[in-house]
Amino acid sequence: MELPDPVRQRLGNFSRAVFSDSNRTGPESNEGPENEMVSSLALQMSLYFNTYYFPLWWVSSIMMLHMKYSILPDYYKFIVITVIILITLIEAIRLYLGYVGNLQEKVPELAGFWLLSLLLQLPLILFLLFNEGLTNLPLEKAIHIIFTLFLAFQVVAAFLTLRKMVNQLAVRFHLQDFDRLSANRGDMRRMRSCIEEI
């Protein structure tokens, strides 16, 4: 299951615009860019632990909502249920994109993961954490703080990984372009020598 081509292209263009380092003139290490692994171990470990933590967060949130449901105003009941449903759906998509983008070094998927984390998931969990009208219980605050720490770390780690991936892809592109030009020059020399012989 892959992202549709228009979405992949837009996320790829967005990633190149945001994460490319225009000040760099060459690769940072002596290894060839084809052999360098740019997926992030820290990000992958965070995604792994987040995968096991999220069901715990979900069950705790549902239990706490059940306990305080009768004292919440009607509009907060609707808002909290909607936010928990949104977080659940977004988290499933976000973790999938994070795994695929990081392990397979796919920039559009990792950019989608980063955008979902930063623009949707983080504001929703901060709403649950800091809204005084929700009368958060101590367990709720604890699980929301841990989830927020996961998200904050993943946003930073994904940004750094994306920068590294985009820079590596740019180096690969320039090396392939250089190889093509070198091959074309070699062909031109051979043609000139053949013409001169004739």
Curated annotation (Swiss-Prot):
Residues bearing glycans: 13, 23
Any Pfam family hit: Transmemb_17
Keywords carried by this UniProt record: Cell membrane, Cell projection, Ciliopathy, Cilium, Cilium biogenesis/degradation, Glycoprotein, Membrane, Transmembrane, Transmembrane helix
GO cellular component terms, A-Z: ciliary membrane; ciliary transition zone; MKS complex
InterPro entries reported in the protein's UniProt record: Uncharacterised_TM-17
GO BP of this protein: cilium assembly; non-motile cilium assembly; smoothened signaling pathway
Localization per record: Cell projection, Cilium membrane
TM annotation in the entry: 45-65, 78-98, 110-130, 142-162
RNA-binding keyword on record: no
Superkingdom as given in the UniProt entry: Eukaryota
Xref: PANTHER family: GEO07735P1-RELATED-RELATED (PTHR13531), TRANSMEMBRANE PROTEIN 17 (PTHR13531:SF14)
Record's subunit section: Part of the tectonic-like complex (also named B9 complex).
Similarity field: Belongs to the TMEM17 family.
Purpose of the protein: Transmembrane component of the tectonic-like complex, a complex localized at the transition zone of primary cilia and acting as a barrier that prevents diffusion of transmembrane proteins between the cilia and plasma membranes. Required for ciliogenesis and sonic hedgehog/SHH signaling.
Entry protein name: Transmembrane protein 17
The species this protein was found in: Homo sapiens
